[in-house]
Amino acid sequence: MSGCPYFQRKFLSTSKQHLKEEENDEAQTGINKASKGGLIYGDYLQLDKIVTSQVLQSELKGNKIHDEHLFIVTHQAYELWFKQVLWELDSVREIFISGHVRDERNMLKVNTRIHRIVMIFRLLLDQFAVLETMTALDFYDFREYLSPASGFQSLQFRLLENKIGVPHNQRVPYNRRHYRDNFRDQESELLLHSEQEPTLLQLVEQWLERTPGLEEDGFNFWGKLEKNIFEGLRREKEHIEQKPASERKEEMLAELIKQRDIFLSLFDEKRHDHLVSTGQRRLSYKALQGALMIYFYREEPRFQVPFQLLTSLMDIDTLMTKWRYNHVCMVHRMIGSKDGTGGSSGYQYLRSTVSDRYKVFVDLFNLATFLIPRDWVPKLDPSEHTFLYMAECCDSSYCSSSDDSD
């Protein structure tokens, strides 16, 4: 320290000022509770297990490859998020299974958890960008150490597919074998059990079938909609036929015939059942009616929350399809047309899974096929408006449950 008396006086004065400021600093008035023992951050999260679970196969073989660590951490992060998605999905399914969804107060809880799944999948899509900082040559350096491990063997992702409602008969065979053949013992049993449980699709289907307003002896939405649509098509045909002969007139009549055929199929229950049997439709005939009713009356307070749920279910399907596509692109970029480490055809197999076969809520997407002018939608008179608002009290299918759900 300098021998200058002036400097010493200024230094001491400044130090005392800082000490005084620290004594009066409200940001420093807390108590360090961790110093007194008890549960601390690392113990609560069991970080000793998580951060030491990255075992590099290349290092075990005496040839440590730097980027294998990124590969492991990224996939472990995927699995942790899959675990959270399953946690949310199981809770939503339990609300439906227990009947608590009939208490409309629980619909907010359902919507919140389904929306959380949507947000997780958006995060998982972004995660590919981190993995793609590794080049194909970087991956090649340690790929030989991974076989026969394969992403197809992700138990949690297969459970997720099953619990959402991917039909096992719509799956693309894996090397001409049933997908469960690639899992052992307890894992195979868990997958079989998940196939036998009610899926989210089935539970949503049952919920849609109870949509108030579908009753033939009540509002009779379906009967009124059918009448309005074909009356509207008849008026359109008369309007077009009044136009002078032209190529445009013929095109308009041809388009009208196509529209009529589309709506004939919509109101043909036998045709619907046939499309369900071939996998082109997934929802029951009555559930489709409920979904379309929610779609048309989405601005009514009674149907705003259900419409948000249907939108989120489509978001999940969309994001899972994008996830598959991003995975396909990444695999193609990393290994080209080589076989996968698990023995599949790699890129070729993965590309075949990016299709509507794996879309669970495809019927919700197809609702847009049946869009009609707003004035064709059956009008609600004042008493019917009241019915919609009071549905949870008046409709036995939507009556409030006295039970609480988690």
UniProtKB/Swiss-Prot annotation:
Pathway: Amino-acid degradation; L-tryptophan degradation via kynurenine pathway; L-kynurenine from L-tryptophan: step 1/2. One of its GO terms (molecular function) is metal ion binding. Substrate binds at F71, I72, V73, T74, H75, R143, T341. Keywords: Dioxygenase, Heme, Iron, Metal-binding, Oxidoreductase, Tryptophan catabolism. The keyword Lyase does not apply. Heme binds at H327. Its EC number is 1.13.11.11. One of its GO terms (biological process) is L-tryptophan catabolic process to kynurenine. It comes from the Eukaryota. It is an enzyme of class 1 (oxidoreductase). The keyword Repeat does not apply. SUPFAM superfamilies: Indolic compounds 2,3-dioxygenase-like (SSF140959). It catalyses: L-tryptophan + O2 = N-formyl-L-kynurenine. Transmembrane segments: none annotated. Binds 1 heme group per subunit. InterPro entries: Trp/Indoleamine_2_3_dOase-like, Trp_2_3_dOase. Heme-dependent dioxygenase that catalyzes the oxidative cleavage of the L-tryptophan (L-Trp) pyrrole ring and converts L-tryptophan to N-formyl-L-kynurenine. Catalyzes the oxidative cleavage of the indole moiety. Belongs to the tryptophan 2,3-dioxygenase family. This is Tryptophan 2,3-dioxygenase A. It comes from Danio rerio (Zebrafish). The gene is tdo2a.
